[in-house]
């Protein structure tokens, strides 16, 4: 299984706030230099690299002398603006010592939710990788709002892995990996070395929240691994403070937790759909529609929908659930919520008679639908 790591040619490496700022003491330039040295070695070995770096808010807090993470959005954004300057300068100077160029990219959820901007971001990242430049990516915390934020950089890293079609997502954290119990409370906790990303048993052991500086706990890392698996990427969750951690991963050493995809890689458009984390409404299906969608490659017709919840416009993402509330799929609606309310339960040839027009015979076309 570790051969999937040693043979990976395109890596996305995500480094969390606690690691980068020595648990809030300011940017740890020494640690950054050690990781850069290893990333340069990977680069020299032919590995293509994208770095997702947390730490802007934490670095800004340190510069401002704040000891507690603020809850007010404007204060968080001010800290991010201050910290991002130092963060990107630190990465740039450290990579430059080894003759490597870096590029700063700041993203919001809107950038990846809009198909055109998504494709532009993908083209830019691919161009940078081909130029052997190392992109340094962070969420654009200075302009993002709660409604359009990724929520944590683990999720952002997974979406970037999908964006660049990475073979491997490496999440460096302050834990050695995922354990079968909380090692802080249970001395008998055992490291989970390998598992399928979609194994439901992992949910029970991934509980808990992130530290005071960051937003992501082990649950967000598991969610990120599952998202990355949609594009066929393997994910390793591993301790960033382990000696020569990236070198050892490349050598195939059995450290950290390797989470592997169960299914094959999704088509490019469906990878984009998988990254649509924000939904605007819910469609409650009947059992016939649930059965049809579960077989795959089927569109959702109005006749199979029992109820419409929420307010959404045409082209926005909706959740499709079974009568018992289980999420079955997500997709882009061909009709607004108001229009959908009028045509659900009706055969497609009745749409014109109800609305006076027909945009599409399907409520959600199979090309715009992804099973979950």
Curated annotation (Swiss-Prot):
Sequence similarity: Belongs to the glutamate 5-kinase family.
The protein's name: Glutamate 5-kinase
Swiss-Prot/TrEMBL keywords: Amino-acid biosynthesis, ATP-binding, Cytoplasm, Kinase, Nucleotide-binding, Proline biosynthesis, Transferase
EC code: 2.7.2.11
Cellular component annotations (GO), alphabetically ordered: cytosol
Location(s), subcellular: Cytoplasm
Native source species: Pseudomonas fluorescens (strain ATCC BAA-477 / NRRL B-23932 / Pf-5)
Binding annotation for ATP: 14, 173-174
Residues spanning the membrane: none
Protein origin, superkingdom: Bacteria
């Amino acid at each position: 299984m570790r051969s999937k790591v040693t043979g990976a040619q395109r890596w996305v490496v995500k480094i969390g706030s606690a690691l980068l700022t020595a648990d809030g003491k300011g940017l740890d330039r020494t640690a950054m230099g050690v990781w850069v040295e290893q990333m340069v070695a990977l680069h020299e070995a032919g590995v293509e690299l994208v770095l997702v770096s947390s730490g802007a808010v934490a670095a800004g807090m340190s510069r401002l002398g704040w000891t507690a993470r603020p809850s007010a959005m404007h204060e968080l954004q001010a800290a991010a603006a201050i910290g991002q300057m130092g963060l990107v300068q630190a990465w740039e100077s450290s990579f430059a010592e080894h003759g490597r160029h870096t590029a700063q990219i700041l993203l919001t959820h809107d950038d990846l939710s809009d198909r055109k901007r998504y494709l532009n971001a993908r083209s830019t990242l691919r161009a940078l990788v081909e130029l052997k430049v190392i992109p340094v990516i962070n969420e654009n915390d200075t302009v993002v709002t709660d409604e359009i934020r990724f929520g944590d950089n683990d999720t952002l890293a997974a979406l970037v892995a999908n964006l660049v079609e990475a073979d491997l997502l490496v999440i460096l954290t302050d834990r050695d990996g995922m354990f079968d119990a909380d090692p802080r409370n249970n001395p008998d906790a055992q490291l989970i070395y390998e598992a399928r990303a979609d194994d439901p048993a992992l949910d029970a052991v991934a509980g808990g929240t992130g530290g005071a500086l960051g937003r992501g706990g082990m649950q967000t890392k598991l969610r990120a691994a599952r998202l990355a698996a949609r594009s066929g990427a393997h994910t390793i969750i591993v301790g960033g403070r382990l000696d020569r951690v990236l070198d050892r991963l490349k050598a195939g050493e059995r450290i950290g937790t390797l989470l592997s995809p169960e299914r094959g890689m999704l088509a490019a458009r469906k990878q984009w759909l998988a990254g649509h984390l924000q939904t605007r409404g819910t469609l409650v299906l009947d059992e016939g529609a649930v059965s049809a969608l579960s077989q795959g490659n089927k569109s959702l017709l109005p006749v199979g929908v029992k109820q419409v919840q929420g307010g959404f416009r045409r082209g926005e993402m909706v959740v499709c659930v079974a009568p018992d509330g289980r999420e079955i799929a997500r997709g882009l609606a061909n009709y607004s919520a108001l229009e959908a309310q009028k045509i659900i339960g009706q055969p497609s040839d009745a749409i014109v008679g109800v609305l006076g027009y027909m945009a599409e015979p399907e409520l959600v076309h199979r090309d715009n639908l992804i099973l979950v």
